[in-house]
Amino acid sequence: MDPIELRSVNIEPYEDSCSVDSIQSCYTGMGNSEKGAMDSQFANEDAESQKFLTNGFLGKKTLTDYADEHHPGTTSFGMSSFNLSNAIMGSGILGLSYAMANTGIVLFVIMLLTVAILSLYSVHLLLKTAKEGGSLIYEKLGEKAFGWPGKIGAFISITMQNIGAMSSYLFIIKYELPEVIRVFMGLEENTGEWYLNGNYLVLFVSVGIILPLSLLKNLGYLGYTSGFSLTCMVFFVSVVIYKKFQIPCPLPVLDHNNGNLTFNNTLPMHVIMLPNNSESTGMNFMVDYTHRDPEGLDEKPAAGPLHGSGVEYEAHSGDKCQPKYFVFNSRTAYAIPILAFAFVCHPEVLPIYSELKDRSRRKMQTVSNISITGMLVMYLLAALFGYLSFYGEVEDELLHAYSKVYTFDTALLMVRLAVLVAVTLTVPIVLFPIRTSVITLLFPRRPFSWVKHFGIAAIIIALNNVLVILVPTIKYIFGFIGASSATMLIFILPAAFYLKLVKKEPLRSPQKIGALVFLVTGIIFMMGSMALIIIDWIYNPPNPDHH
């Protein structure tokens, strides 16, 4: 009997409960590979700290057979809400301002609300399917619905989503670690030395920190970093709101090659400095002194981007500092995938549901409502104030945009350090379920092997590093993963599983019709987004110098 399957068994209290030390003797029918994964993940860890380190392995409490949906869980309502919020929150928040800049405020808010509501409906379908299908494992639901192809489809979608998350975390290291080192060394600009090269740094961090942590058998203690990760994102949003009222508009025209302020001789300019509550730091920039158009001047965009800045600064235009409410361009295609990437939490919904104390579908739906609503508010604040800080000059990774304005800033340095520590410690947690799924799929019922344990981790990390080094910007990760695996996990798979496994509702019932419409909507979103992204790649090929 599968230890995590929902079966109709005797629901008398389970007196001979298996302890962690006797897992192997209690489950002799379980493959050695699976036992090794479970023993390594959950030894000496309580249910609160286990959280959701893997997709499907639910902790030592869940190693007993679940009698039915009302088998008592161990995790409180509040902790479950916190866990799901942390599962939703991720690096996607850093790309939302870029999405708003390429959709406009009104269109972005409509799309954000739409994706949030659809995510809630998707969770509803998933919870109902789990009950009717009799499983709390995403891949197992796929197998029950469509056999081996369904299992592989769910496996590929979850693996791609986790690889996308890993790559986005490594991108943040590549973007932000050089800035942190530059500030600590007191350099005005990135001089191009090897220790300021993001490609080298991400390799060093991967080999020196991430790989050793990924080789540990027990990663349970890293689950506590999820709380730190969520806290640092709250701090990040607070700093974004605060900095909105410090950054002027138009943006400063800075020559990053010479480290000096430059200006157009035809426009009256003057130098000012904004303090950042630090004695030795500040923000220098040039602004139009008169804030009016000099007579006889025909303002045109500056000739090309400033070298090394990654941002094209234009001469002051009338609407440069006016927010746009509706925007359509080639980059608008990235908006829905970025939003989908930001709201994916579905592989973690079932493990969290299984551990919810006195659980019911209604209670878990309430947990989902609270978590997604909370993240919706944070996403909206981060996107809005990040966009209003830079308008059309916002970058696809918001933190990196601030380095174009601030040379040294204590608050931003603290945010960068917090985010770097959080994402570095999160990568092994994301890697662990990928490795477990690969071992289970390729080496079923094989004994634990350190060679496989090390080799698969090294291959996954190496592939992610190659991806991060070769792909010029994080928006391509957000876009491609959001349009493919995120759309599969939010829209297509839950609806398809529901239509196939929930037998008691007729096909023409409102519930089934709604699920069918949801499925078709997901397919349209995926095909449309992928087509537009590919068109953007063709007509606006990636710039290898962008970083």
UniProtKB/Swiss-Prot annotation:
Record-annotated site: Influences on amino acid transport capacity: C232
Stretches in topological domain Cytoplasmic: 126-151, 217-220, 354-369, 433-453, 498-514
Membrane topology reported for the UniProt record: Multi-pass membrane protein
Segments on the Extracellular side according to the record's topology features: 1-104, 173-195, 242-332, 391-411, 475-476, 536-547
Annotated positions of the Phosphoserine modification: S49
Entry keyword annotation includes Disulfide bond: yes
Free-text description of this protein's post-translational modifications in UniProt: The disulfide bond plays an important role in substrate transport, but has no effect on trafficking to the cell surface.
Tissues expressed in: Expressed predominantly in liver, and at lower level in skeletal muscle.
Superkingdom of origin: Eukaryota
Pfam (any one): Aa_trans
Compartment list: Cell membrane; Cell projection, Microvillus membrane
Enzymatic reactions: L-alanine(in) + Na(+)(in) = L-alanine(out) + Na(+)(out); L-serine(in) + Na(+)(in) = L-serine(out) + Na(+)(out); glycine(in) + Na(+)(in) = glycine(out) + Na(+)(out); L-cysteine(in) + Na(+)(in) = L-cysteine(out) + Na(+)(out)
Keywords: Amino-acid transport, Cell membrane, Cell projection, Disulfide bond, Glycoprotein, Ion transport, Membrane, Phosphoprotein, Sodium, Sodium transport, Symport, Transmembrane, Transmembrane helix, Transport
Family, as annotated: Belongs to the amino acid/polyamine transporter 2 family.
Function: Symporter that cotransports neutral amino acids and sodium ions from the extraccellular to the intracellular side of the cell membrane. The transport is electrogenic, pH dependent and partially tolerates substitution of Na(+) by Li(+). Preferentially transports smaller amino acids, such as glycine, L-alanine, L-serine, L-asparagine and L-threonine, followed by L-cysteine, L-histidine, L-proline and L-glutamine and L-methionine.
Protein name: Sodium-coupled neutral amino acid transporter 4
Species in which this protein is naturally found: Rattus norvegicus
Lineage, highest ranks first: Eukaryota, Metazoa, Chordata, Craniata, Vertebrata
Encoding gene per record: Slc38a4
